[in-house]
A protein has these predicted regions:
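Short, charged, intrinsically disordered terminal tails
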Residues: 1-4
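Compact, glycine-rich, soluble single-domain proteins
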Residues: 6-99
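Acidic/glycine-rich phosphate/pyrophosphate-binding loops and surrounding catalytic core
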Residues: 85-122
Length: 122
C-alpha cells in the first residue's frame, strides 16, 4: 500500500489544493468519511463542514483544514477528488470581518422581523 494518494480540492473558481495526502476526512451526508491510499471506489455528497487532510509538503506532513460548503467527493484507489461550492482555509478567515458580517446579518433579520410584524400583526 502506498503511503500517500494524489488529492485535489476544487471550487468553481480555483484549484484550492493539489498534492499528496496520507489521509482525507470530509463530512458526507452519512457522516464523516476518511479516505486512505488504496481506498475502494467511493462517491459521496458532502455537507458544509470541516475538511481535514494530512498532506505532504517538502517531505513533511502538514494538517490542512478548511471550511467547505456542499459538494462531492470521489475516491478511487489511486486518487481523491473533492468538488465543493466554496472552501476557505482557517488561516484565511478574517475574524473581525466575519463578526461584522454576522452582526449585519442579525440586524437585517431583526429589521425583516419588525417589518413582517407591522404588516401582518404577528
Amino acid at each position: 500500500m502506498a503511503n500517500t494518494i494524489p488529492f485535489k480540492l476544487i471550487t468553481p473558481t480555483q484549484v484550492v489544493f493539489e498534492g499528496d495526502a496520507e489521509l482525507v476526512i470530509a463530512v458526507t451526508t452519512e457522516g464523516e468519511e476518511g479516505i486512505l491510499p488504496s481506498h475502494a471506489p467511493f462517491l459521496a455528497a458532502l455537507k458544509p463542514g470541516v475538511l481535514r487532510a494530512n498532506v505532504r509538503k517538502d517531505g513533511n506532513v502538514e494538517r490542512l483544514e478548511l471550511a467547505t460548503r456542499e459538494g462531492f467527493m470521489q475516491a478511487l484507489p489511486d486518487r481523491v477528488t473533492v468538488l465543493v461550492d466554496e472552501a476557505l482555509r482557517f488561516d484565511d478567515v478574517d475574524v473581525a470581518k466575519a463578526r461584522e458580517e454576522a452582526a449585519s446579518s442579525d440586524r437585517v433579520t431583526a429589521d425583516f422581523g419588525a417589518a413582517k410584524l407591522r404588516l401582518t400583526g404577528h
